[in-house]
C-alpha cells in the first residue's frame, strides 16, 4: 500500500556540477536534500533497486548521508553506503555493483561551510541535463512513500575500497612498479586520505602523506590542489621525485615537479597526449574547454594532435569526448578523463598514468613537457548578483575586451557554482590584462 504526501515545487536547483550551496541554506538543507532524493528515486529507479552513496570528509556529510539514506530507503531502494570515498571511486562502484544510480555528497574544492550532491547514472557518469530537468519536475509532484513491507534497506560495503584500488592498480603489470619513486601526496584532508597513501605504498613508492588528517572542518584548508603552495615547498625540501595534489573529493589533480614547479591540467593533458602518441591506437584527438590555454592547442597541433573545445565542466568535456570519439580530455583545473579507464575525472589514476610513463619509458616530467609553450593566462573574479547580468551583456563585454586586446583573448563567463563573474585573459602583457579586467569590473559595477 502506498501513502501520498503533498509538496510544493522548487525548481532550478542543478548547476554546472550538480547541486551545491552553503549548508543550512537552500538547496543544502536536510529537508530539501530528502525531497531531492525521493525525486531522483522516482525518476532513476521507479521499479526499485540499489543506490550507491558516498561522500567526502566535511562535517555536514554525516547529516546529508543520513537524510539520503532515510529518503531512499523510504522510496523502496536498497542503499549501499561507502562513507568517505573519492568521487571517481563512487563512480566506479556504482557501475561495478550494477546500481541503478549513485549519489556523491561533496562540494569538491569548496570549504567545509559548503556541500553539494552529484547524481550518477548506472554507468557511473554524471546525469545529463534532461534527467536533471525530470528530477526537478518531479519535485513538484506528490512523492510516493512505502509501508514497512516494501521499504529498502541500507548496508555498508566493506569490499568497495579494495575493489577500487585493484581497478586503479590494474594499469600496471609488474609488482611494486613505483619502488624507485619518492612521492609526496596531499589529500586535502579529503576523500582520498586513506586510499591514496595506501595505494601508492602498495605499488612500492616511498610515500610522504600530507593533508591526510580530516576533522570535518579542514577539507581544502591551506592544502590540496586549490592551495598548492604547501606541497610545492615540500617536494624539493624532501628531495622527492614528484608531488600529487588532490582536491577534496579527489576527482582532480595537480602535480609538482622535483624543483617545486606546479603542473596544472593543461600541462598534464599535454604529457598524457605525448605519451599516447606512442600508442598506435591513439586517434590524435583530445578535448579541452573554452578555457584551455591556446598555447596547448598550438603545441598539440605541432604534434599532429587536434584539440576540441567544450563549455566549462567535466560533464561537458565527457559529452564532447563521446561526440568526437576522443579518449583523452580535461580542464586546466585538473579534471582529467581517460576513457580507456574511466568516465570520471580521477586525480589518483591520472597521477599514476604519468608515473607509469616515467617508469616504463625511463623519462622525466621535464622531458614529457618538452615542446609545450603556454601563453600567460590571468584569471580574475568579480563577486556580483548574476541574475542582474544578461547573457547579451556578457557577450558584449567579452567582444569589446577582445577588440581591445591584440595577440591574445578574453573570456567572460558566469560561474556555475558561485555568485561570481569569471574573467580569463591570455596575454603576454600582464599590465594590459589588468587594465582590461578593471575596465570590465567598472562596467559590471
Residue ranges of each PLM-predicted region?
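An N-terminal, well-structured beta->alpha segment
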Residues: 2-75, 101, 154-183
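Phosphate-binding and adjacent anionic-ligand microenvironments
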Residues: 242, 278, 282-445
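Short glycine-rich phosphate-binding loop at a beta-alpha junction
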Residues: 48-56, 80, 182-184, 284-290, ...
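Proline/glycine-rich low-complexity loops and linkers
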Residues: 89, 133-166, 170, 257-332, ...
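Buried hydrophobic positions in well-ordered alpha/beta secondary-structure cores of metabolic enzymes
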Residues: 17, 53, 90, 103, ...
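N-terminal small/polar loop signature for handling phosphorylated ligands or for N-terminal nucleophile
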Residues: 38, 42, 50-115, 198-256
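Gly/Ser/Thr-rich loops at beta-strand to alpha-helix junctions
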Residues: 57-62, 110-111, 188-193, 250-251, ...
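Gly/Ser/Thr-enriched, mixed-charge loops and adjacent short helices
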Residues: 3-10, 22, 115-238
